[in-house]
Design a protein with these regions (language model features):
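Specific transmembrane helices
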Residues: 2-3, 18-161, 189, 256-291
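Alpha-helical transmembrane segments and their helix-entry boundary regions
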Residues: 34-38, 108, 171, 185-186, ...
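Transmembrane alpha-helix/helix-exit interface in multi-pass inner-membrane proteins
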Residues: 120-128, 164-165, 182-204
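Hydrophobic/aromatic residues in alpha-helical transmembrane segments
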Residues: 121, 172, 228-232
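Membrane-interface helix/loop boundary segments of multi-pass membrane proteins
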Residues: 163-190, 236-240
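Membrane-interface interhelical connector segments
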Residues: 167, 171-174, 202-213
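Functionally important transmembrane alpha-helices
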Residues: 210-272
Length: 291
């Protein structure tokens, strides 16, 4: 309560109340959300991919194509379940969600170019260092094998970027960021992403199966999930999930067109992406966002 004092003329003067500062909002605990998301993402993906493995793989049995493709949508299914659950409960959007706005479209396009450039630069440098030569014939064959440019681009967009990014970046990332720093979240999601991909090494007909898990190329693929997670996270922080989808699409598409399989090329790309994300993360600061 305010206190009263007297002036020299005896007139009471009310002293101002002490200033108060608003307490910071409580840090929400998203462990239940994250557990539910991870269980759904892994269960949907691994059950589908397990079925593809049991059917003999996509190389020898066309029936394996459906579960193989459906497996990629585990993270998206998890994201949709959490979104519906949050709305039904009337819960607020997590503080670290980055909403996409039309004004950010140019930034997303620039990040798409950057993502592709990290792969192209790595392949060119590896070629100069004695690695495999780049060939347009490989790219032409990759596009032709799936029925032309339109089918190729749609397939590359859906099977990976669209099926994964709303989950890993749009759902898991903001909730992990509530208690962890950006770099810590990148490491957590990078390792999680690498583990999530492991069944693909056992599906005949996949890129991962061709690489082989117990080979330098397979090991480098697994390790590359960490700088890749950092790269798409840096894109997400700047322009939302549309940007992370764009970067994921650009990297995957460029790697397929260039047939990146040699360890020397993979290592060079991994190094360039690591340097790129270091620069991106160091030059970007994020506060707590509220919708």
């Amino acid at each position: 309560m305010p206190t009263s004092q007297s002036t020299s003329h005896g007139t009471p003067v009310t002293a101002p109340a002490p200033a108060t500062t608003a307490a910071p909002g409580p840090v929400r605990d998203y462990r239940a959300d994250l557990t539910l998301f991870m269980v759904i993402a892994f269960a949907v993906s691994w059950l589908c991919w397990g079925a593809a493995i049991a059917l003999g793989g996509t190389e020898t049995n066309e029936a394996a194509n459906a579960p193989y493709l459906l497996g990629a949508f585990g993270p998206l299914v998890g994201a949709l379940v959490l979104r519906i659950r949050r709305r039904r409960r009337g819960e607020p959007v997590p503080a670290h969600v980055v909403r996409f706005r039309p004004a950010l479209l140019l930034k997303a396009l620039l990040l798409l170019v950057l993502g592709s450039a990290t792969v192209l630069a790595g392949a060119l440098l590896a070629s100069r260092a004695g690695g495999p030569e780049l060939s347009l014939d490989v790219a032409k064959d990759a596009v032709k094998d799936v029925g032309g440019p339109a089918a190729f681009l749609v397939g590359m967009l859906v099977s990976g970027p669209l099926s994964e990014e709303p989950g890993w970046r749009g759902t898991a990332y903001p909730r992990l960021r509530e208690k962890l720093g950006t770099l810590q979240v990148c490491l957590v999601l990078g390792v999680t992403w690498a583990v999530w991909h492991l069944p693909l090494f056992f599906i005949d007909g996949t890129v991962q199966h061709d690489l082989g898990l117990a080979t330098p190329s397979g090991v480098l693929f697994v390790v590359s999930n960490i700088p890749m997670a950092m790269l798409v996270t840096a894109a997400y922080e700047r322009a939302g999930v549309v940007a992370s989808i764009a970067v994921h699409f650009a990297v995957n598409t460029t790697m397929i067109l260039l047939a990146v399989e040699e360890p020397k090329v993979q290592a060079m790309i991994l190094g360039i992406q690591s340097l790129t994300v270091t620069a991106l993360l160091l030059t970007h600061r994020t506060g707590r966002r509220r919708p």
